[in-house]
Swiss-Prot record:
It is a multi-pass membrane protein. Residues 23-43 are lumenal. The keyword Membrane applies. The gene is mmgt. Part of the endoplasmic reticulum membrane protein complex (EMC) that enables the energy-independent insertion into endoplasmic reticulum membranes of newly synthesized membrane proteins. Preferentially accommodates proteins with transmembrane domains that are weakly hydrophobic or contain destabilizing features such as charged and aromatic residues. Involved in the cotranslational insertion of multi-pass membrane proteins in which stop-transfer membrane-anchor sequences become ER membrane spanning helices. Disulfide bonds: none annotated. Residues 1-3, 64-105 are cytoplasmic. Coiled coil: none annotated. GO terms for molecular function: inorganic cation transmembrane transporter activity; magnesium ion transmembrane transporter activity. This is ER membrane protein complex subunit 5 homolog. Keywords: Endoplasmic reticulum, Magnesium, Membrane, Transmembrane, Transmembrane helix, Transport.
Length: 105
């Protein structure tokens, strides 16, 4: 499938999904105005949402710009020392000092 057609499927899928959201909001507003209980979204809105999901997924899958997910391509650029270096996971305010005080009493 050509790239342009895949983009068209994506745009159509997103626009149908936005219309689905708008329809659901309008339905909810209508139920509030008429004091009816909310029992769920109507069937046509659910079908419209599923159709938009399939159109958008089809467009994304056929866009031909998917990047392969391989660890070797990302890890080839790093040195061996940087694999396990994660400073964001270093915690200095932990319960170790309190446990040390309790255990040494």
């Amino acid at each position: 499938m050509k790239k342009g057609i895949a983009k068209i499927f994506c745009v159509i899928g997103i626009s149908i999904f936005l219309h689905t959201v708008y329809s659901a909001l309008q339905h909810r507003k209508y139920l509030r105005l008429t004091d009816q209980p909310f029992e769920g979204v109507p069937f046509d809105i659910v079908v419209e949402c599923i159709i938009s999901l399939f159109l958008f997924a089809w467009g994304i899958i056929n866009s031909q710009f998917l990047i392969p997910i391989k660890a070797s391509t990302h890890l080839a650029k790093k040195s061996f020392d940087s694999y396990d270096y994660r400073p964001n996971f270093t915690v200095f305010n932990h319960r170790g000092k309190y446990l040390n005080e309790i255990l040494n009493k």
